Swiss-Prot record:
Bilayer-crossing regions: 4-24
Native species: Vitis vinifera
Lineage, top ranks: Eukaryota, Viridiplantae, Streptophyta, Embryophyta, Tracheophyta
Enzyme class (EC, first level): oxidoreductase
Annotated localization: Membrane
Principal location: membrane
Record-given protein name: Beta-amyrin 28-monooxygenase
Pfam short name (any one): p450
Signal sequence region: none
Length: 480
């Protein structure tokens, strides 16, 4: 009997040894080839993902990249992230290369969790779906459309502050910023303005957003499982809205130009076919994610920096009050007003330089190519990082200093300031985000000054930057 169990133990040990050997061999085989970039690959499956993520959790996502740039004396290095062989491109030259070679040498890549949350797309077709989406969006984000949104944004902002800020001594900024940007997205994308209807989406939407880019393990209790459940709930609600909009369009109760939902329902492809309800629901869901999370992070950090830098706040206040005093009672903001907010936008840009809502993004090499003398194999994942230029002294002298004058005149050098990405995949909602941020700034400084309640509150990045406790502040209302 003892010999039998000893034999089983030996077989088990041998099997594990062979399995580990094959795993290491397979892992390392992805990183073989002539003249690859310098770097290390870490453990099988894990690679350097834990260190990559942990620097963000500690509030310093740039450390992962700057440590390796210094170690290897190279602006491109190899690593292994999210179970994939990867090269990190750091610096303006790397940004320019990736942004300029979209759909030539590289194309977009998303973690598998994204495609599993959006089951109407496979990993291959999701890229085609993204292209279709970008053809639809210009109609919604063209200048004449954006001009119409400003008054709506101002109206929603006034209601938001009346409901959630007024008559309060203290507030927690981050959840309120998310509420504001989500309300705007619901109104402008789907014409949903009723706070109760918006609130029905709000909680499941935040569950979805927080679990979208996680380890795709669909087991009860995991963030990914909760994200799947939340996405199914939201889709069900969206399909009900879509069905009703179809009826309203047929009866003349809604118009094609009403919002992006109407536009999607009436748009056709090259063959004259309309999108089905599931496609539209997924596209609206993707727009809600893209049109809400990044702006809410930018707004939160605007509040943070204006609390820490009273002289910056005062200059923003002065500019905004000059605009406010030029308005008739009850008159909403318009396009001309927003164009006058030059200093305020410079402040917002400096905030996004120091705390970029979009930390970076992945591409995939669709062919072998050479960059900076190093070979990049087909199939490798490529990561560009906003922080690699935003916090580089070569791109921004004294990068730790808050200095809005960096954005005066011609502003930063090309490919150094990239909070919205760049090239063909630059965020199509960049101007939309600018408007909602400036409208928020106008309304908040008109009403309040504020102090941080936690002076040393930790910042975490997961995957966007956010104050660990949501940025609680004490409000000091201004007299009307």
């Amino acid at each position: 009997m003892e010999v039998f169990f000893l034999s089983l133990l030996l077989i088990f040990v041998l099997s594990v040894s062979i399995g580990l050997h094959l795993l290491f061999y397979k892992h390392r085989s992805h990183f073989t080839g002539p003249n690859l970039p310098p770097g290390k690959i870490g453990w099988p499956m894990v690679g350097e993902s834990l260190e990559f993520l942990s620097t963000g959790w500690k509030g310093h996502p740039e450390k992962f990249i700057f440590d390796r740039i210094s170690k290897y004396s190279s602006e491109v290095f190899k690593t292994s992230l999210l179970g994939e062989p990867a090269a990190v491109f750091a610096g303006a030259a790397g940004n320019k290369f990736l942004f300029s070679n979209e759909n030539k040498l590289v194309h977009a890549w998303w973690p598998s969790s994204v495609d599993k949350v959006f089951p109407s797309s496979t990993q291959t077709s999701s890229k085609e779906e993204a292209k279709k989406m970008r053809k639809l969006l210009p109609q919604f984000f063209k200048p004449e459309a954006l001009q119409r949104y400003i008054g709506i944004m101002d109206h929603i902002a006034q209601r938001h502050f009346a409901d959630s800020w007024d008559n309060r001594d203290e507030v927690i900024v981050f959840p309120l910023a998310k509420r504001f940007t989500f309300w705007l997205a619901c109104r402008l994308f789907m014409s949903i303005e009723d706070p109760a209807h918006v609130a029905k989406f709000e909680k499941p939407f935040h569950v979805l957003a927080s679990g979208l880019i996680t380890v795709p393990i669909d087991l009860p209790g995991t963030p990914f499982h909760r994200a799947i459940k939340a996405s199914n709930f939201i889709r069900k609600e969206l399909r009900a809205i879509i069905k009703q909009r179809k009826i309203d369009l047929a009866e003349g109760k809604a118009s094609q130009n009403q919002d992006i939902l109407s536009h999607m329902l009436l748009a056709t492809d090259e063959d004259g076919c309309h999108m089905n309800e599931m496609e539209i629901a997924d596209k609206i869901l993707g727009l809600l994610i893209g049109g809400h999370d990044t702006a809410s992070a930018a707004i939160t950090f605007l509040i943070k920096y204006m609390a820490e830098l009273p002289h910056i706040y005062e200059k923003v206040y002065e500019e905004q009050m000059e605009i406010a005093n030029s308005k008739a009672p009850g008159e909403l903001l318009n396009w001309d007003d927003v164009q006058k907010m030059r200093y305020s936008w410079n402040v917002a840009c400096e905030v996004m330089r120091l705390a970029p809502p979009l930390q970076g993004a992945f591409r995939e090499a669709i062919t072998d190519f050479v960059f900076n003398g190093f070979s990049i194999p087909k199939g490798w994942k490529l990561y560009w990082s906003a922080n690699s230029t935003h916090k580089s002294p070569e791109c921004f002298p004294q990068p730790e200093n808050f200095d809005p004058t960096r954005f005066e005149g011609d502003g930063p050098a090309p490919y150094t300031f990239v909070p919205f990405g760049g090239g063909p995949r630059m965020c199509p909602g960049k101007e939309y985000a600018r408007l909602e941020i400036l409208v928020f700034m106008h309304n908040v400084v008109k009403r309040f000054k504020w102090d941080k309640l936690l002076p040393d509150e930790k910042i975490i990045v997961d995957p966007m930057p956010m104050p660990a406790k949501g940025l609680p502040v004490r409000l000091h209302p201004r007299k009307p």
